[in-house]
Design a protein with these regions (language model features):
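N-terminal secretory signal peptides and thylakoid transit peptides that target proteins
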Residues: 2-21
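Short amphipathic alpha-helix with an adjacent loop that forms part of the alpha/beta core around
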Residues: 97-103
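N-terminal Rossmann-like dinucleotide-binding module
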Residues: 19-86, 164-167, 259
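Conserved SAM-binding strand-loop segment of SAM-dependent methyltransferases
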Residues: 90-94
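Predominantly a Rossmann-like dinucleotide-binding segment in NAD(P)-dependent oxidoreductases
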Residues: 33, 50, 54-58, 154-160, ...
């Protein structure tokens, strides 16, 4: 479908079509499209890239539209669900081939491993296609910046797959904080139960035969090539630096989302991290990351002072609030957030679920402030995907952007990934000063080195423990620059 746009406002459209209603019972969809948007009754042609896992769930929530193409590097994984659900959709392993061959695609859903997010999204947006992209938005800070800029340049509808952003919980938290309910917030604690996959791993020495249904070269994509081993895919890629971003990258776009939105954050000015032993291959098993954010513009009912945000994962937790009674859960099974204000505290679970004042007894007499944020229908089911579809059908001039469009999701992802960088650079043993505008650490120099574990062996010999830990020293600044802006391997276009 080709959709033309015009400068015709939505108000003028409604006025003119209302006047015409007496004489014309039904307007053809092509006429309505010519007035500046695609009628909700028209269906988008959506292609899926990465359809074997979370991508299947996303496509299922988009099944009100035409699913016209399916692309996955692992056809065995995709066959379990997406290929069976949409057997007539053309199937591909290489999204570049899909875009070359199939010209009827209006929009794409991308749910590949983190390192393969940016390139298909860029290719789609440059072709004028709307993009739904799983979290974190990208694998690097630079990629997140470029995707947000590209979405603005091409005027496409975008959405990151942090579905809690469409929920009621994040809206209530924002409205409470903006109304001054707990006063000025200077401290936030956030945590997750992740990782629930192996981390702290060493690269396997054994090379395995690549399954016939997997295109290993395409899985590697822009990352540095390595021999195939079953430990990497289809699920545990999150536990490898080259492909994923660990527990922080996986969950912070969900858990820190209400923090970022409610406190109107952008660039942190500093970050510091500590963790269990870290190596060159895999994120640590547990980590604590602290961000410092500068003062922001005050709101009508509350000031926005400097704030410290601390992240915990791998079993690490913040101190339990004294306001919680014995037996009352702290957050939920997946994690949670506690906002510390000058007049009280707010706690929620993962995805901003079930927000409450602390102590929870305060909710008995609490009067909710006015609802000022647009609500998303069916947010607890398919609302996040459907809100993107709605935005895609509106013209860029009249569009109400989806809730986690790239202009929001890009900076959120930059914040998250800057914390990932701090973990990888923690051997510097200092607070890192972040220059957000220029995507660089301001207090690093070329002489600094970081020591990382390359091998960590342990055995018991004659009842005594024997440790054999090997280290490597790498240049800190050069490594940080590569992690901020990747150099893709040959054959993959730089962005």
């Amino acid at each position: 479908m080709e959709h033309t746009t015009s400068k015709l406002s939505r108000r003028h459209f409604l006025e003119t079509t209302s006047l015409a209603a007496a004489a014309v019972t039904i307007l053809p969809s092509k006429v309505i499209a010519g007035m500046g948007y695609v009628p909700p009754s028209d269906k988008l042609n959506i292609a899926g890239i990465g359809v074997g896992g979370m991508g299947f769930n996303n496509l299922t929530n988009m099944a009100t539209e035409n699913i016209v193409a399916l692309c996955d590097v692992d056809w065995n994984y995709a066959e379990r669900n997406s290929f069976r659900k949409w057997p007539n959709a053309p199937k591909y392993q290489d999204y570049r081939v899909m875009f070359d061959k199939q010209k009827d695609i209006d929009a794409v859903m991308i749910a590949t491993p983190d390192h393969s997010h940016a390139l298909p999204a860029m290719l789609a947006m440059r072709a004028g296609k709307h993009v739904y992209l799983q979290k974190p938005l990208t694998h690097s800070v630079y990629e997140a910046r470029v995707l947000a800029e590209t979405a603005r340049r091409y005027g496409v509808a975008t959405q990151m797959g942090n579905q809690g952003n469409s929920g009621e919980g994040i809206r209530r938290i924002c409205e409470w904080i903006w109304a001054g309910t707990i006063g000025e917030i200077t401290k936030v604690d956030a945590w997750t139960n992740r990782p629930i996959w192996p981390q702290g791993l060493e690269r396997p020495a054994k090379e395995m035969r690549v399954p016939k249904t997997l295109n290993w070269d395409l899985f590697i994509g822009p990352a540095k090539f390595r021999p195939y081993n079953e430990v990497y895919t289809p699920w545990n890629w999150r536990g490898w630096w080259d492909f994923g971003t660990g527990a922080l990258g996986d969950m912070a776009c969900h858990i820190l989302d209400p923090v970022f939105k409610a406190l109107k954050l952008k660039y942190a000015t500093a970050v510091e991290a500590s963790s269990t032993p870290i190596n060159t291959e895999s994120p640590p098993n547990a980590e604590m990351v602290t961000y410092w954010f500068p003062q922001r513009d005050n709101l009508p009912k509350v000031a926005m002072p400097e704030v410290k945000v601390t992240w915990y994962d791998g079993g690490l937790m913040p101190e339990r609030p004294t306001e919680l009674k014995d037996g009352e859960p702290m957050g939920d099974w997946n994690g949670g957030v506690i906002f510390h204000g000058s007049k009280g505290k707010i706690m929620c679970g993962c995805y901003a679920a079930n927000p409450t004042l602390l102590p929870t007894s305060e909710m008995e007499t609490f009067k909710e402030p006015e609802k000022t944020i647009r609500r998303i229908p069916n947010a607890e089911t398919n609302g996040h995907e459907q809100d993107w579809i709605r935005a895609a059908k509106e013209s860029k001039d009249n569009r109400v952007e989806a809730s986690s469009n790239f202009s929001y999701a890009g900076p959120l992802t930059e914040m998250v990934l800057m914390g990932v960088l701090a973990v990888r650079l923690e051997d510097l043993k200092k607070r890192l000063l972040w220059d957000g505008e220029n995507m660089r650490f301001a207090n690093m120099n070329h002489s600094e080195q970081i020591r990382v574990i390359t091998s960590n062996k342990f055995e018991v010999v004659n009842g005594d423990p024997k440790f054999n830990t090997k280290y490597d020293t790498i240049p800190a600044l050069a490594s940080a620059e590569e992690w901020i802006r990747h150099n893709y391997r040959d054959g993959w276009e730089q962005i």
